[in-house]
Amino acid sequence: MALALPVGMAFGAIASGWLSDRVFHSNRSRVISLFLFLAAACSVAMYFLPRDHWLGVPMLLLTGFFTYGPQSAFWALCPDLLGRARAGTGTGVMNTFAYVFAGLGEPLIGWVIESNGETSLVFAIVAAACLTGSIISPFIRR
C-alpha cells in the first residue's frame, strides 16, 4: 500500500504535463484545476473508505496521481508567465513558498491528527486544500 501514493504521483506528473501541452494547448490552469478537483474527490473518498478496504490501494494511487500531477503544470507556469529570462527566479520563488508552507503545514496537520486521534483526517485536510486550489487556479492567466 505504501508504494501506491508515490507511483500515482510519478504517473500523474507525466500525465498532467502531457495533457497540459497536448489536450489543453498549454493552458496550465485548466489541467491544474481539473486535477486538483479530482484530487479533492479522491481524498474525500479516502477519508470515508474503511481501513483495509480493497479499494484503498487503487484509491491511494489515484489520490497521488491527481494530487501531485499538477506539479509539472505549476513549474511550466514560470516560463509561461515570466519569460525565459526570469524562469529560474520564478521557479526558485515557487519552490520557496512550497517548502515554507509544507514546513508550516506539517506540524499543523500533525497537531490536528494528534488532537483527534484520527489519522484519516489528513485526507480531509488535503481535500480542502485541493478544492481551494481547484477553485482559485482558473484565475491564472498568461
What does each of the following model-derived ranges do?
Residues 53-69:
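Hydrophobic core of transmembrane alpha-helices in multi-pass small-molecule transporters
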Residues 27, 109-129:
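A membrane-interface helix-boundary motif in multi-pass transporters
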